[in-house]
A protein has these predicted regions:
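N-terminal auxiliary segments of SAM/dcSAM-dependent transferases
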Residues: 1-19
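Conserved SAM-binding loop and adjacent beta-strand
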Residues: 11, 29-48, 53
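Conserved SAM/SAH cofactor-binding pocket of Class I
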Residues: 45-118, 124-127, 132-134
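A short glycine-rich, Lys/Arg-flanked "PGG" loop and its adjoining helix->strand segment in the class I
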Residues: 147-163
Length: 229
């Protein structure tokens, strides 16, 4: 992903840009991840558009960036809390919420992952994480690098979901997918691939994550029956 960015798309990064992505008008601040330059965001937006969601469902969008995922799901009738560790991204997302007249349905908070919503639970959590391990060197770096981000996401997810809640997670072969799945499994979640897109040198996925007792009860019954044979 990074190589494609450097070779073909870097000229549109680092500038104040007005875009319309999947019909949603956006302003992209210079130091904020541009959702139109990489496939992870469109893939995640496609999964969001296909969701069956009750009006008024509570949704958390982690690492919101421009706020496009939060806006997309708010347009489906959800009430959304969006968080980002970057002060500039928070300003950008709040601007886009205003542009789309969604102040009554989307609030944007500054903080790392679940920290701004410590005791709150949601019907759906959305996360398009940074794929590379390490400490960001600048605000723009938070879109690319994070310290144990996926591990901390897996640990924090359970306490922030309602009993039948779920998560949508965008991941790539740029990370160790087996480690990601293992981390979620160790924290009581099973993953199901719902989107997949190949690009040269990389495959991007969207996983649906649900508590194991919901996703796996049918599998557990089948295993028990097989053991009795």
């Amino acid at each position: 992903m990074w190589l494609l960015f450097v070779l073909f798309r870097g000229r549109r990064h680092g500038r104040l840009i007005f875009e319309r992505i999947r019909g949603i008008p956006l302003v992209v601040f210079p130091e904020v991840f541009h959702p139109g330059l990489f496939l992870s965001t469109p893939l995640l937006l496609g999964a969001i558009e296909d969701l069956e969601l009750e009006t008024g469902s509570l949704v958390l969008d982690l690492g919101t960036g421009t706020g496009i995922c939060a806006i997309s799901i708010a347009l489906k009738g959800a009430r959304v809390t969006a968080t980002d560790i970057s002060t500039i991204a928070v300003r950008c997302a709040r601007t886009n919420v205003l542009i789309n007249n969604l102040e009554d349905r989307v609030r944007v908070l500054e903080g790392d992952l679940f920290q701004p919503v410590e005791k709150q639970r949601f019907d759906l959590v959305i996360f398009n994480p940074p794929y590379y391990e390490g400490k960001p060197g600048e605000w723009a770096g938070y879109a690319w690098r994070g310290e144990n981000v996926l591990h901390r996401f897996a640990e924090g997810l359970g306490p922030h979901l309602t009993p039948k809640g779920r998560a949508l997670l965008s991941v790539s072969t740029e990370v160790d997918l087996l480690t990601v799945k293992k981390g979620l499994q160790e924290n009581g979640f099973e993953t199901r691939e719902i989107r997949k897109r190949w690009i040269p040198g990389e495959t991007i996925y969207v996983y649906e994550c649900r508590p194991s007792q919901i996703c796996g009860h049918v599998r557990g019954e089948a295993t028990s029956e097989a053991g009795q044979e």
